[in-house]
């Protein structure tokens, strides 16, 4: 039986709708475009085109993964962040739009102080590469504990021809030479509590738990980074964190107790507390 593009899209949309996709028609179209290696305009222009059996078989494999709830970014192997097409894999978190708020605030502070930038827990390299793309004369370093993540970030830098970003594997500050100083340190660290029910829902089910979960009510890694960051910050440098919507007070308290100054929490595009930043100064203001 011959199957047209229009018929395949209709059947795929119905399957994904039944499996609970939030955007079944869009998902179906994107997956078919991926299999055909064609833009979406092709589907609209040639709705009566007959699809070959290998194409249908490839589409069904992708649909099965999506019906099981696997994130589209992992199925496609790519996600856009800060207008940069980034390769992603199950070894890294999927870059999210809310994290662009962290990039915006980092760029604001980078304009106030010269020096290199550091991204801790870099994953795909999304934050580091966004900053490097906007600040081509500044060196940006990204660090991730997982070797496969650091390698993926390097691959993304190469694919995007971004030459002022470098990536290392290691635990937080461990790969850095003693005496290395940065104008800004940014991080989207693990900040979810171990028993958070959201860990069993949606895309998060498929993402690496080590990049999501932290002890001490989700604050352990934020506390660790905050404690050691002054050793690597220039005088007047800034530390910026992405964190959970209900962690603003706790993160501000951590920074205040450690002597950071000019501490503020900023909201994401939905109006939720999302980024907290503080400034390191060798002399405390009166």
From Swiss-Prot:
Any one Gene Ontology BP term: methylation
Binding site residues for substrate: 188-191
Reactions it catalyzes: L-glutaminyl-[peptide chain release factor] + S-adenosyl-L-methionine = N(5)-methyl-L-glutaminyl-[peptide chain release factor] + S-adenosyl-L-homocysteine + H(+)
Keyword Aminoacyl-tRNA synthetase: no
Record key words, sorted: Methyltransferase, S-adenosyl-L-methionine, Transferase
MF term (GO), any: protein-glutamine N-methyltransferase activity
Keyword S-adenosyl-L-methionine tagged: yes
EC number(s) given by UniProt: 2.1.1.297
Binding site for S-adenosyl-L-methionine: 121-125, 144, 172, 188
InterPro entries: DNA_methylase_N6_adenine_CS, HemK-like, N5-glutamine_MTase, PrmC_N, RF_methyltr_PrmC, SAM-dependent_MTases_sf, Small_mtfrase_dom
SUPFAM superfamilies (UniProt xref): S-adenosyl-L-methionine-dependent methyltransferases (SSF53335)
Its job: Methylates the class 1 translation termination release factors RF1/PrfA and RF2/PrfB on the glutamine residue of the universally conserved GGQ motif.
Family: Belongs to the protein N5-glutamine methyltransferase family. PrmC subfamily.
The name this protein goes by in its record: Release factor glutamine methyltransferase
Originating organism: Vibrio cholerae serotype O1 (strain ATCC 39315 / El Tor Inaba N16961)
């Amino acid at each position: 039986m011959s199957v047209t593009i229009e018929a395949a899209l209709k059947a795929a949309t119905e399957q994904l709708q039944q499996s609970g996709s939030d955007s079944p028609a869009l998902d179906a179209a994107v997956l078919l475009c991926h299999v055909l290696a064609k833009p979406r305009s092709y589907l609209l222009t040639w709705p009566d085109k007959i699809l070959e059996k290998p194409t249908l078989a490839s589409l069904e494999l992708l649909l099965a993964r999506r019906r099981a709830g696997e994130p589209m970014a992992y199925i496609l192997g790519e996600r856009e962040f800060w207008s940069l097409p980034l390769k992603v894999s199950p070894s890294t978190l999927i870059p999210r739009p809310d994290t662009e708020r962290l990039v915006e605030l980092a760029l604001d502070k980078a304009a106030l102080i010269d020096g290199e930038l550091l991204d801790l827990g870099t994953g795909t390299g999304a934050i580091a590469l966004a900053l490097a793309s906007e600040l081509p004369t500044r060196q940006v370093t990204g660090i991730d504990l997982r070797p496969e993540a650091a390698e993926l970030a390097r691959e993304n830098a190469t694919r995007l021809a971004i030459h002022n970003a470098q990536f290392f594997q290691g635990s937080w500050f461990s790969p850095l030479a003693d005496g290395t100083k940065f104008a800004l340190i940014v991080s989207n660290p693990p900040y979810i509590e171990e028993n958070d029910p959201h860990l069993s829902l949606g895309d998060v089910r498929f993402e690496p738990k080590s990049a999501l979960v932290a002890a001490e009510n989700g604050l352990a890694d934020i506390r660790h980074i905050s404690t050691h960051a002054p050793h690597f910050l220039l005088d007047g440098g800034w530390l910026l964190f992405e964190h959970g919507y209900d962690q603003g007070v706790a993160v501000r308290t951590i920074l205040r107790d450690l002597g950071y100054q000019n501490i503020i929490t900023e909201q994401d595009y939905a109006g939720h507390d999302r980024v907290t930043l503080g400034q390191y100064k060798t002399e405390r203001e009166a």
